[in-house]
């Protein structure tokens, strides 16, 4: 088995000299061909290299896969997380999507986890997606933030907010984040329902039965508001909101999302499909190679590290 890194790195220049880093994983040779190209939007405080395993699963099954790090987030792209907002996440996703279109990429299927799923729901009616798959996707941002942070900071006047909100060891700039939530209506369940109601994009949502941050009944509510009915909910049994908490949960996530992508590429919402599973050595090699690639890119631009 080759130890050569198959990941292809791209850099997209954006406004004010900023850059979005994108990684490309081509489909494996001799893999069954697919109609769709996959774009992966990582969850909050997760970098694109955290999804190396999922990219390998999808590539092994014939998908061309792209991932990116959002602006003002963890990872390789420009900016610091204390300036991150949901609108920044939206703009980063749309920039990468439109870049793929300029490359002639058609039939883009989007996979989004956690907070990035809320971004995906925001734009689902604006982008021409083949399908959307979400995992532990946030539908009620205010409620999820209260669960994650231990307090409903969105209830405070702006001038009473702390300087930072500590989210999994990362410092969110509270004022810029909260102002954006209110100004662009990111905060409520109803705002999510309004965005998805008229979409015709097929959607599979994965919840986790031990997720303390996202209420499964609210995900059901969201799907019930999609008038097309082209949607289905599945549960990742034994998982919490942290899809990487152990290898069993992580493997189930990889398998389930890969099967969903195969099914939806074929026009179905039923994920009882055959798939090819990469072996552990292959996943390990891909992960190690991407860590080296990340370190190499950071060494060329220390200010991004």
From Swiss-Prot:
Keywords: Acyltransferase, Luminescence, Transferase. It is an enzyme of class 2 (transferase). Pathway: Lipid metabolism; fatty acid reduction for biolumincescence. The active site is at residues 114, 211, 241. Its EC number is 2.3.1.-. The keyword Transferase applies. One of its GO terms (molecular function) is acyltransferase activity, transferring groups other than amino-acyl groups. One of its GO terms (biological process) is fatty acid metabolic process. InterPro entries: AB_hydrolase_fold, LuxD. Disulfide bonds: none annotated. Acyl transferase is part of the fatty acid reductase system required for aldehyde biosynthesis; it produces fatty acids for the luminescent reaction. Belongs to the LuxD family. NCBIfam families: PRK13604.1. This is Acyl transferase.
